[in-house]
Amino acid sequence: MSSVDRRHEIVQAALRVIAADGVSGATTRAIVAEAGMSLASFHYAFTSRDEMMRELVAYVVESETVAAFSALRFGTDIRTSIRDSLTAYFELAVVADPGHEQVMFELMQYALRTPGIEHLAREQYDRYRAAVSGLLETGAENAGIRWSLPVEDVARLVVTISDGLTLGWLADRDTAAAMRVIEFAADSLSRLAEPAPTNSTVRTTTKERSA
């Protein structure tokens, strides 16, 4: 087994262990037992449990980002792009695998409560916001708009909405209500969009300034 494959198998095993026993139960011994590997295999693949946790966060965020990007359709308006991306995240990341989302929330809480690894929570949300910023920039270019606020601020708002959407659904499993939230979020976020300046607009503005 290659090092890349070994790392992947360990991350998958860690996700299963955390979903079943929580982050505190995800010891290196428990993870390698779930993966069917030796303890030496873990230390061959990762230098520490902290490094493995970072890899786990990166894996889940990347999976969610791929799902959201795959929902973007060229030629659609920004509201449709927002709705489709949130729906893809909700259906493919939350509903299809709620255990992953529970793991991510628990990982953040565990990091915040554990001295020395608080940075993991910050890194987790840095990754979320960076991924969403990329989606927002792609969606804006596709729809011919620009954001009336800095894209980093819009990304922070989207992450806040998706957190509430996810936690609400994990608590009540009311999919219909979650879809209504997505529609409302698409309405609200699309109001932060404004037409992007065209080449003719730029030329006109330049002439006016020169006059």
Please tell me what each predicted stretch does.
Residues 2, 53-60:
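Alpha-helical DNA-contacting segments of helix-turn-helix folds
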Residues 79-87, 129, 133, 179-190:
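Hydrophobic core segments within long, regular secondary-structure runs in both alpha-
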Residues 98-105, 115-141, 153:
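Amphipathic alpha-helical packing segments from all-alpha helical-bundle domains
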Residues 55, 69-101, 151-158:
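Hydrophobic alpha-helical connector segments
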Residues 48, 110-115:
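Short loop-to-helix capping motifs
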Residues 60-70:
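Conserved alpha-helical segments that form or flank metal/cofactor-binding pockets of metalloenzymes
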Residues 6-9, 13-55:
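Helix-turn-helix
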Residues 116-122, 140-204, 209-211:
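Hydrophobic/aromatic-rich alpha-helical bundle segments in the mid-to-C-terminal region
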